[in-house]
From Swiss-Prot:
Residues 1267-1288 are cytoplasmic. The keyword Isomerase does not apply. Residues 33-59 have a biased composition (Low complexity). Keywords: Cell adhesion, Disulfide bond, EGF-like domain, Glycoprotein, Membrane, Repeat, Signal, Transmembrane, Transmembrane helix. Glycans are attached at N359, N706. It is found in: Membrane. Residues 183-364, 370-545, 793-958, 1016-1203 form the Laminin G-like domain. Residues 23-61, 1215-1236 are annotated as: Disordered. Residues 585-792 form the Fibrinogen C-terminal domain. It holds the Pfam family EGF. This is Contactin-associated protein-like 3B.
Amino acid sequence: MASVAWAVLKVLLLLPTQTWSPVGAGNPPDCDSPLASALPRSSFSSSSELSSSHGPGFSRLNRRDGAGGWTPLVSNKYQWLQIDLGERMEVTAVATQGGYGSSDWVTSYLLMFSDGGRNWKQYRREESIWGFPGNTNADSVVHYRLQPPFEARFLRFLPLAWNPRGRIGMRIEVYGCAYKSEVVYFDGQSALLYTLDKKPLKPIRDVISLKFKAMQSNGILLHREGQHGNHITLELIKGKLVFFLNSGNAKLPSTIAPVTLTLGSLLDDQHWHSVLIELLDTQVNFTVDKHTHHFQAKGDSSNLDLNFEISFGGILSPGRSRAFTRKSFHGCLENLYYNGVDVTELAKKHKPQILMMGNVSFSCPQPQTVPVTFLSSRSYLALPGNSGEDKVSVTFQFRTWNRAGHLLFGELQRGSGSFVLFLKDGKLKLSLFQAGQSPRNVTAGAGLNDGQWHSVSFSAKWSHMNVVVDDDTAVQPLVAVLIDSGDTYYFGGCLGNSSGSGCKSPLGGFQGCLRLITIGDKAVDPILVQQGALGSFRDLQIDSCGITDRCLPSYCEHGGECSQSWDTFSCDCLGTGYTGETCHSSLYEQSCEAHKHRGNPSGLYYIDADGSGPLGPFLVYCNMTADSAWTVVRHGGPDAVTLRGAPSGHPLSAVSFAYAAGAGQLRAAVNLAERCEQRLALRCGTARRPDSRDGTPLSWWVGRTNETHTSWGGSLPDAQKCTCGLEGNCIDSQYYCNCDAGQNEWTSDTIVLSQKEHLPVTQIVMTDTGQPHSEADYTLGPLLCRGDKSFWNSASFNTETSYLHFPAFHGELTADVCFFFKTTVSSGVFMENLGITDFIRIELRAPTEVTFSFDVGNGPCEVTVQSPTPFNDNQWHHVRAERNVKGASLQVDQLPQKMQPAPADGHVRLQLNSQLFIGGTATRQRGFLGCIRSLQLNGVALDLEERATVTPGVEPGCAGHCSTYGHLCRNGGRCREKRRGVTCDCAFSAYDGPFCSNEISAYFATGSSMTYHFQEHYTLSENSSSLVSSLHRDVTLTREMITLSFRTTRTPSLLLYVSSFYEEYLSVILANNGSLQIRYKLDRHQNPDAFTFDFKNMADGQLHQVKINREEAVVMVEVNQSAKKQVILSSGTEFNAVKSLILGKVLEAAGADPDTRRAATSGFTGCLSAVRFGCAAPLKAALRPSGPSRVTVRGHVAPMARCAAGAASGSPARELAPRLAGGAGRSGPVDEGEPLVNADRRDSAVIGGVIAVEIFILLCITAIAIRIYQQRKLRKENESKVSKKEEC
């Protein structure tokens, strides 16, 4: 809200400041005197009495006269004991006792109060609890202090439960003090105008307070108006109090929108409600009863042109005529104070500051209507009808929250029919049933379950029936027939099927309030019903409307929308980003680190940095790397800012940078991260800062806390140094930034801002000295934050008596606890926090059970999750427990969530006062042995490691994460432990990326090839074949796993060719018809085994996956993760002396069959990805080299992002990286066929000869050694023919 709005409010409330408080309106702070003990017996009354000696006059506390207390004639829930205090008093406490020397006492009761003995209101504890705790014997006294106190003349005690072996018996006392009350009554056509002191004083504090009792649901309570439409108004609208603040004429353009605040509900219940408006400096507090709304008014206190008048009860039209421009207030105001001035007293004394319009009086009339509350779906009220009349006519008013329910049923005379009036979907429906005719239905009204009073009039006579709901009339014509009124009408429900009445309520009974019931032309007096003189009833509360607004205050968090019925409320969390009964639990992970360990790849994600805290989720980019996860928050500022010379002292540029997240969200994300940084790239040409030597900063930046910073990069605060200045390598040593040198050439500074407490940058200001040709530009990068400090924050508990302690957990209305644990023990307490009687505890109760137990005053409650597998398996398990006003829930890992609803109208506040114990209990028993990690309470992370460093028996950190997160490493990747987390080692995988899940793909042009060498490259003569055979004897395979994916439209194609020094080979080809063919030749003296797999034409331009798994002679082939086929080899079981693997065109396929040679000559044109042969990943070795290369590339081979996402087969993708032509990872031309290693060429024949001789001698020696080794090994192989599987 802008300054004008604040000034309006300030001036409107302007009066000399006085020391004043609402208590000072008439009540001393010491208010606990006994009020009932001195009253005469006539001040006590009751529903009934067992005898004259058990009458209500004997119910004073600690008295023994009479029979020693009050006992009713019948002990049931419709009995009551009433006290008349003689005048309105402030009541602060009550006390109860049983009947003296008897077995008669009350164990729980309701307390109700009233001003005039009618229209009773129930006192509720903690805004929801109905009953008060009573006695457990006849003589002990139970006191209960009322918070908050209330003002009343009449009190009623209604027993709810009593000693089952006795009767109801009560002695009572009421404590409090006198209450000062100044009342003014407005009849809906009157008002009071108060003229303020016109002295131009500016008080520090402005206060207006009052109480009101409304007879109608709408009306103006107070109004103040200026000459240009400025005004404040306090208005009752549909039982809610609305505070309007308008700072200007609505007809004129204004940038200041009117402020509207709404508080309270059901305020038209004809009971007193308090209002307090406070203005302290710029802070405005608006309070209705116990509910306060705070808001900060912006601007100063400059005065506007306002009238020094304020009206109460209505808004007078110009000229002070008696005409009112809006609905005026009908009801009473009490103790009306304006900055400590008693306005009512001024009016009663006819002071000149007061002008009264209309019928204003100084006493408050008591309500005349008698409401009836239908407490349950079993409630009903049976009233006699006007038997024999030729019409049916009923009127009444009702209010409810329920969308459906039975309102009225009646039978017509002589069994001629019946009618039923009911609510369905918030609409009123009437159905008339007549013998021999189809039912007649009428619908009227809509949204009638809004808690407001609605008037209903129903009549049926001869040829028509009509229903009027408020102003909505519905008429239904009838066949002319005589309609005779029946004997009994059933309101709210039916007596029961056994009554023989024929009454049915298929939609359930009505829960709500009724009043002003008339049958025919006769008004019904519910007091006669209460006394048993009229009709009958069940589960009613007469002379009281017990409706409550369960959405005030709303327990729905994070913007969830509250809706309610009579018994409960519910929260609609759609679109909030939260879930749960009260929209408390976030749907999103807390950080990119948490997203990563869910197995999510890089991308856009919502994160909720404070979990279930008040800050909402926001969108970020998560960059998943092998070591960590980076959170990237981009700003909405310009990509680049260009600066040119300007007059000296004038800013060249002051650019602000806004972010999609709010300041609080950014602060939470930055605080959560291990490290944050933001890069500034600055380029400058002929720009300089000659005045920087005297310490005057010519450029600065503003962080999230709106503080100005002149330090750049990693420099110390206010050092005015760039990174080059710290490192001492600036281009001009007399300056601390390259761009300060003012060179006549373009220079640059790359600055990394890494002071986490100030990030992100919200503004950058650049100035210059006015050089006409100075020029510069800069680019601010996104905010980058690495990791999550809380995600791996952990502690190891080594003894059962060890624990960590923290301050008490404050989660009165909502408490959620989430953490990870791992253990090998069968039981132990994870956390415990105690109060005087309340407590909360989470424990591993058994190897397969986790239990969440607590007590908020309704008795201990437990929620248990049972698992089919043990939790003590030394793997991480995630626990999330939540307790709120709706109930409790517990979830462990992905097991079904267990829930326990809260009792209706029970205690809701969890009150804890001891220390919070983690890993143990206060008694040092049942302690937890194991690790606890990432512990959060209501979204706030606890630093376990910090506490563990100073706690005996507890160590910071936990080892062994791969047992839980190892599954994230896919496609052959291996999990490696880190101090804080895990990383995936993709060295032996055909994939890379943080989870070894990013496929490595390449486009092969026509005629290109890629060769992977399993052995060092040697050039040997044909005569040395036997020597080579011995040399490569160790590379013998009896099994191999092969995977590849491809996309092509060419046939025939060679997908993969593996050769051997023994002329053995394996080929995977696409035949001319596109079928997949596999050939194994494992014995050079036999023909190859050839297998054709007619799954489909696989040269269709689509991506296909092939997986081949050989175990000796058994080969299993799987295509596209679905089609499978098994074949048996006949040519052998050992693949000896494996030489190389070739993708694409094969120049020489010695000993290959004709089909393989044709495919080898054609090669492969298209995309290959994720190629793996055992531990060898040729594409990865070429495109992601990490050591000496074993790969030779010929022709055009270019990397692709993904085969499935690339261009069509036969053409390379546009986004490809630079192609690999004749080499991988090398610059300059490379001869075709050269291995991708840094081998020196030797052209000297002499040196070559010497080397050849040396190699020959060496090979001979090696062959002899190998032969001896083979002879020894042969004996073992003869004993066991089991082949050893190749391991990576």
